[in-house]
Each structure stands twice: as C-alpha cells, then as structure tokens.
C-alpha cells in the first residue's frame, strides 16, 4: 500500500508535526509499505501532493490539520486517512464547542468564559469562575501562548498574547490536581498515564523537551479508574470519535474533569500515546499498523 505521511502544515505546531512525521515514517517503513513523505507548506499542497496515494497518515497538528479541513479535502479526493472525521476534528479543535458539548452531556469540565477582544473581557464573570485561570487560544494546541494568571492584573496581557494566535481566547478555571491522559484506540481505553511536569503546568517545554516532565503509567484506585474510563468512553461517544483520540483530564479530590480531546495526538519519541500503548505490549510499529487498519474500516 502506498501511504503518504502528511506533515508540516501552516500552524504554530509545524515543528511538532514534522517531528511526528519523521517518527511515523521510520516505523511505518518497518511494515513494508511504500511510504511517501508529504510536507505541507501551504494549503493547496494537499490537493497536489496527495495524488496517487492509497492512504494518508496524518501527522499534522493544529489549524489546517486537526480542525477537519484536511480531512474534508481528503474525503473529496476519495483518499482514506487516519483518525477522526471532519466534524469531530473541527469540534475538538474548538475548545469552547467541546466544553459546551461536555457540559450538555453532564461530563465534568472546568468553568470557563470565552472572549474575542480585550474590550469584551468580562472581569465579573472571571471572578465567578475564580482565580487562578488559564488563558489560552481557543483553537490552539501544544500549550502555545497559554498562561496561568493568578489575578485580575494579568488578564489583559495574557488575552492580548493569545489573540495573536487565534481570534478567540478561552479563560478557564485552573483546577489543581493530578493531570492524567487516557489514550483511546478503537473505542477502548489503553493504560492511564499520569503527567507530572517539572514546570508549574504542562507547557510547551514540558511537552516536547527531553526531561520536561515525567509521564508514568499508573494504576488508579478501582472506583476512580471506573469513573475515568466511563468518562473517556462518554467523550468518545458524545463527540463521535473514530480510530484514536487522547482525552486529557485533571483529577481533583477523586473527581475527574475533562480538559480537552486531541484527535491527532503527537507521535514523537516523547509522545503520550505510544507510551500508553507500549504499557500493554503494543510496539510503536504495531500501534501505527492498528491506526491504519481501523481507519480503513471507517465508512466516510
């Protein structure tokens, strides 16, 4: 099978995507497929460079990658691809829409408000949410332009920074607890990982630098594990996920809260999904093979 590994892109997460793509290529080649690296520098590259491939493995992150646009182009070209479809990808990229659906489905998530300009910051609403808060681009990833703000004085500057990366900004209550991630493969949860960043929170450096954080497989207490698994599965169903996603949560006082869903989780050597799969004996090559197999089974 001729597999095109699509990477690069036009988002702020381009470098992360290129790293993911290189790792994916290295291990897909072990499976004896014909691998074609497809580096995207501008949107129209997808139409041109994807011609003639049998399958697209998406190693993209951020806008024009995780937001459903590339998925829509590939469906138009009748090229099967890895991961979730356009609708789920678009919703999960929009943190505000994701949280609205979670709230409607009675899935725990931290309180938040969204703003689209410095002028419409509602300081009273933020006070109700309670400080400290995270200020971040509504559709960003990899914690780019994400800041932990401890009082009213820091809000304006943090919003201005986030608005450089997106037209909308999320201001979300900081729920202090243990950060965990649940990797879902074909609707089943792999072992849970605890994320223990060496910084104050799991920022860009903690995510991608060697030694930026400790990520360890943990065995949760039985009742908590059941709650976490039920919540991860509820996210999968409510947001109509397919093939694989990563559900990030915070556990506070024994109660899990969903932070966000990643529809194209990172695939670098430091990435969480391969670590979780490895804990049940699934090698990186086997994981990639499963993603290809399950993706081909999805009716688009």
From Swiss-Prot:
Residues involved in ATP binding: 126-181
Binding site for Mg(2+) 2: 260, 262
SMART domains named in the record: GARS_A
Broadest EC class assigned to this enzyme: ligase
Gene Ontology MF annotations: ATP binding; D-alanine-D-alanine ligase activity; metal ion binding
Cofactor: Mg(2+); Mn(2+)
Pfam families in alphabetical order: Dala_Dala_lig_C, Dala_Dala_lig_N
Residue ranges crossing the lipid bilayer per the database entry: none
Binding-site residues for Mg(2+) 1, renumbered to this chain: 248, 260
Protein's recorded name: D-alanine--D-alanine ligase
Species, as recorded: Clostridium botulinum (strain Hall / ATCC 3502 / NCTC 13319 / Type A)
């Amino acid at each position: 099978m001729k597999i095109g590994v699509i990477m690069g892109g036009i988002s702020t997460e381009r470098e992360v995507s290129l790293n993911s793509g290189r790792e994916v290529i290295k291990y897909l080649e072990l499976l004896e497929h014909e691998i074609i690296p497809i580096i995207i520098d501008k949107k129209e590259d997808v139409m041109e460079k994807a011609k003639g491939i049998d399958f697209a493995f998406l190693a993209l992150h951020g806008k024009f990658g995780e937001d459903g646009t590339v998925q829509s182009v590939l469906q138009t070209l009748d090229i099967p691809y890895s991961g979730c479809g356009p609708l789920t990808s678009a919703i999960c990229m929009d943190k505000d829409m994701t949280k609205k659906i979670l709230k409607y489905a009675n899935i725990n998530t931290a309180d938040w408000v969204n703003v689209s300009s410095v002028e419409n910051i509602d300081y009273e609403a933020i006070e109700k949410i309670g400080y400290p808060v995270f200020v971040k681009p509504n559709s960003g990833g990899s914690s780019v332009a994400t800041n932990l703000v401890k009082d009213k004085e820091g809000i304006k500057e943090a919003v201005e920074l986030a608005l450089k990366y997106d037209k909308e900004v999320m201001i979300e209550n900081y729920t202090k607890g243990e950060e965990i991630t649940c990797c879902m493969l074909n609707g089943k949860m792999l072992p849970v990982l605890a994320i223990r960043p060496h910084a104050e929170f799991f920022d860009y450096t903690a995510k991608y630098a060697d030694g930026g954080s400790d990520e360890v497989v943990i065995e949760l207490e039985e009742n908590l594990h059941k709650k976490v698994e039920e919540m991860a599965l509820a996210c999968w169903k409510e947001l109509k996920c397919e093939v694989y996603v990563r559900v990030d949560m915070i556990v506070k006082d024994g109660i899990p809260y969903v932070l966000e869903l990643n529809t194209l989780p990172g695939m670098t050597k430091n990435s969480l999904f391969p670590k979780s799969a490895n804990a049940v004996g699934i090698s990186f090559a086997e994981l990639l093979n499963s993603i290809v197999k399950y993706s081909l089974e999805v009716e688009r």
